[in-house]
Amino acid sequence: GRVMTAEDVKYVLDFACSGLSMNEMGYLLVDKIKGAREYNTKSVSKLLEGGVSGIKVVDENTVTIELVEPFVGFDRVLTHSGLAIFPKEAYEKYKEDAKKHPVGTGPFQMKLWKDNKIVLNRNSKYWKKDEFGNQLPFLEKISMTYAENKKSELLAFRNREIDLVLEIPVEEIEYILGSLEEAQEGKTVKHKIESKNSLSSTYFGFSHNSEPFNDVRVRKAFNFGIDRNLIVNEYLKGEGYPCANGFVPNIEGYTSERVKGFKLNVEQAKKLLAQAGYPDGKDFPELELYVNTQKGSSIFLLAQGVKEQLKKNLNVDVKLHLCSITERDDAIQRGEAKFWRGGWIADYPDPENFLTLFSSEHIGTNSSTMNQVKYNSAKYDGLLHASMKERNPKVRNDLFVQCDQLLIKDAAIMPLINDDFITMINSKVKNFETNSMEQLDFSFIFIKEPKN
């Protein structure tokens, strides 16, 4: 290995601004950094000499980045895990396979990536120490496996084959593992369950360019026609939080409670549906809800709850179409999907990262994530653009609130729940840390076997 320098930082940022097909980070930077858009269009086949004009190396420890216009959230953008620094040599050696051979400055090195298994070995040259001066990381090896379903994953946990389960379905825990009392009595694995508010939102998307959802009254009727509290409490067994306000969850410095969201109002929903030409759901077209999940999952239960609420309250029949993410996205691109499950987890902790999803500039880009609903509002775009330039935190948050409130006013989507990030850990695993963006830090973990 070698020492990381400012040249490496510039190389990675240039790469992230490029038009190369394997670059997935362009949307974060190309409209923010001076010269990045021009570089993006010219670097489709290869990286160009000199890189982005707005990114300059001052010395071996300093890089300057010139923005197109002020953006106070830019430091948060740079925390995105996809902008982790890697050396030029790694890309030149592995090319399109570089993602399978990660090279960086982290606490672990990839030893194996095969089929459903990844093995990480300790990086003995890692630069970081803990507060007591102990060299990190403490673990010698981490093995990760992918299970076919959560039930088999939980059984592996019970059989002590794995020590950590992510995104656990609450309703399965006691059935598979038994109660906490049984664990304390030694009848099953001693474990702890941690739940953290996640900076993620689940919503259902509407095709704004297709009937019946090109009519805002139908979109509003669907939003008023469901009881989000009931769905969370009855169908999801309390997992997650109903979107009582806007689309953006609470983020440090931003309070979503200022946005007035949709609440159950069956009378208003029926009135709007009738005004749109579908009294009591009569003549409403056949509707499929594309859901990228498997039967029995929490997302399936959420979709089932919405389906049953729409039938009960609006007499609208919805057929669940369970599929892969790729199938869902392809159906949206072809215009076949009119109604689908969508979601977003923050790339970085800033409201702008949620709200930029619905900028009209993404229409026509065929993006599989950005503005799939084709929401088009000049007013929204103006508010969003103003928020990105604004330096005063209070004024900036006021603009975010106005954006989020406009998404509700126009019923751009059906906001449903802000998610929990629930993990289950063997009690012998100490110092496990995660954050609201569901990122994991293994560098401080150590194992302390229980005394017999």
Describe the predicted segments one by one:
Residues V3-K10, D14-K88:
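Surface-exposed binding/hinge segments that line
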Residues I65, G133-T145, E161, K282-E288, ...:
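A local structural motif
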Residues V72, K117, A221-Y254, S298-K307, ...:
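Detector for C-terminal structural segments
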Residues N121-K129, K196-A221, G225, E234, ...:
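A bilobed periplasmic-binding-protein/Venus flytrap-type ligand-binding module shared by bacterial periplasmic
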